[in-house]
Design a protein with these regions (language model features):
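Transmembrane helix-loop-helix hairpins at lipid-water interfaces of multipass membrane proteins
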Residues: 18-75, 155-160, 271-275
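A short amphipathic helical element positioned immediately N-terminal to and/or at the very start
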Residues: 1-15, 118
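Helix-loop-helix
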Residues: 48-50, 54, 153-167, 241-310, ...
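Juxtamembrane helix-loop junctions of ABC transporter transmembrane domains
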Residues: 23-24, 31-44, 68-115, 119-123, ...
Length: 573
């Protein structure tokens, strides 16, 4: 019931279209129900009269039928066009809501869910939901009207023959209800398996260069074959269930024709029914069978739609772990004093501490470098400052304000991040630089590119700033992508900077250019740097050596070398 209420809520903005759609569906059904009755009346009364009476009545009857079918055609046009558009609008609304919610979800959600499943919910599930949103109520409404209307006329024609038919219908619906739960579980499994196929496909295509460089095409083919075959198995269970459902329902429909012919013939033999009425019965059975077939097919659509909607709701009802507190305030006039006070952290699904009682302070405009072995928690420290994750205990402040008391948007607007793994969006160089400030002028973009030492390279390209970078920036070298990402941060112009191993994967020439850019970028900004190379480390105002138990050593490069501890050993290694 909760799911149904949530689903009905999405019809709200389109109530007028929805109800007009149902009115048109009613008219379509009534016209179909009216024709056998008109034919019966003509057969039993008009066609028993003289030829002149018949001929004089045909023109008015034809005109009436013409008007009736014109109205039905217009209603069908509305249902087919506006009804489908209503479903499309609802699909758009849900897709936008789902995308917006994905944008709000915390890093922890993405740590635990794969993008292929998320894409499946955004595309495949919502298509099935939209189809059901339109066809579900409409087909159900039409079918119910035709079934009830047909039975009313069947009872009026001969109630004795209608009773066994009604019994068969109850048997059919009882069987259908018993199959519903089984069908729903197979459709849910089917949705999960197509999500797995999407995940495998996306993973392989995103890493196609690695696949081909290792000549591992056969390995990936086998992985995909397994995912694809598992999807086939889920479809097999799905269609087996549907096959038994359709087969039994078709059997019940055949029984209706059998009962109509045999029991109807018996009633004619007993003089309790006219042969012409049996012909009308056959017409109404035809009208009656059609909506039953539609309802049978609708069952599959309902199961697909509701399975998809449940997966949609599961995401929409997932609350982001990181949210603004009720009284959160915007962060303004930032000087850049950053303090970590007894900070401990573990991931939500693991009680093992990644950081334990870490404390340090960075004066405004100063820099620290985090050094230490991989896995010691350096990147975690950098992820806690913009609240990608929340501390498990302790607190982090900026200018004395606990970051949990600040709005996420204002907090992250004051922090610029340059990462080792640069992500460029599929678009132009200009669009990627402007990501740091979406409303930036062309002059501002060019100025940021100059500061990042990438302007001359961009100008050397045939299309300049309008050069298409390819998916994830595949048309550019690592150094070029890194400088574009630095230009992005120059444009953002934040008072606090995080440099996460920004030069560790580059050649010496690229590193030299980028190091110059980073030095300009870091000037007068509070900067946290994660680095392995000596040239990057030694220029910091303070170096923190992070080990398994937190901060093992701290001091300037010279002080730590003189101490001859972990840091000195780390540099010699």
């Amino acid at each position: 019931m909760h799911t149904l209420k949530k689903f009905i809520h999405y019809y709200g903005p389109y109530k007028a279209v929805f109800f007009l759609d149902l009115i048109c569906a009613t008219i379509i059904s009534l016209v179909d129900l009216a024709y056998p009755q008109i034919l019966r009346t003509c057969t039993n009364t008009l066609f028993t009269k003289s030829s002149s009476s018949i001929l004089s009545a045909l023109l008015p009857i034809a005109a009436g039928l013409l008007i009736m079918y014109l109205i039905q055609s217009l209603c069908k046009y509305y249902v087919s066009y506006q009804g489908h558009m209503m479903g499309a609008y609802m699909e758009r609304d849900m897709r936008q809501q789902l995308f917006d919610h994905y944008e709000k979800l915390s890093f922890s959600y993405y740590d635990q869910n794969n993008s292929g499943q998320m894409m499946s919910k955004l595309v495949s599930d919502l298509f099935d939901i939209a189809e059901f949103a339109h066809h579900g109520p409409e087909n159900l409404f039409i079918s119910v009207i035709k079934i009830i209307g047909s039975f009313i006329f069947l009872f009026l024609i001969n109630w004795k023959l209608a009773i066994p038919l009604l019994f068969l219908v109850f048997c059919m619906f009882a069987f259908s209800m018993s199959q519903n739960r089984r069908m729903q579980s197979t459709f849910m499994e089917n949705r999960k398996k197509i999500g797995d196929v999407n995940s495998r496909l996306q993973d392989t295509l995103a890493g196609i260069r690695v696949v081909q460089s290792f000549a591992n095409e056969d390995v990936e083919k086998e992985k995909f074959r397994k995912s694809n075959h598992n999807f086939l198995l889920s479809k097999d269970a799905n269609y087996k269930c549907m096959g038994s459902f359709m087969g039994y329902n078709l059997f019940f429909q055949g029984m209706m024709y059998l009962v109509t012919l045999v029991f109807g013939g018996y009633l004619i033999a007993k003089g309790e029914m006219q042969a012409t009425d049996l012909a009308m019965y056959a017409l109404y059975i035809g009208i009656f069978i059609s909506p039953i077939q539609i309802l049978v097919e609708l069952t599959e659509m309902i199961q697909k739609g509701f399975s998809g909607f449940k997966r949609f709701l599961a995401v929409m009802e997932t609350e982001p772990e990181i949210q603004d507190s009720p009284d959160a305030k915007p962060l303004k006039d930032v000087r850049g004093l950053v303090s970590f006070e007894d900070v401990s952290f573990h991931y939500s699904d693991d009680d093992t501490l990644v950081l334990s009682n870490v404390s340090f302070q960075i004066p405004a405009g100063k820099s620290i470098t985090l050094a230490g072995p991989s896995g010691s928690g350096k990147t975690t420290i950098c992820s806690l400052l913009p609240r990608f994750y929340d501390v498990s205990s302790g607190r982090i402040t900026i200018d004395g304000k606990d970051i949990r008391d600040l709005t996420l948007e204002s907090l992250r607007n004051q922090i610029g991040i340059v990462q080792q793994d640069v992500y460029l969006f599929c678009g132009t160089i200009k669009e990627n630089i402007a990501y740091g400030k979406p409303n930036a002028s062309m002059d501002e973009i060019v100025d940021a590119a100059r500061k990042a030492n990438i302007h001359d390279f961009i100008e050397s390209l045939p299309d300049g700033y309008d050069t298409f970078v390819g998916e994830r920036g595949t048309r550019l070298s690592g150094g070029q992508k890194q400088r574009i990402s630095i230009a992005r941060v120059f444009l953002k112009n934040p008072p606090i900077l995080i440099l996460d191993e920004a030069t560790s994967a580059l050649d010496n020439e690229s590193e030299r250019w980028i190091q110059q850019s980073l030095e300009v970028l870091a000037k007068n900004r509070t900067t946290i740097t994660i680095a392995h190379r000596l040239s990057t480390i030694q220029g910091a105002d303070e170096i923190l050596v992070i080990a398994d138990n937190g901060i093992a050593e701290r001091g300037t490069h010279e002080e730590l070398i003189e101490k001859n501890g972990i840091y000195a050993h780390y540099l010699r290694a």
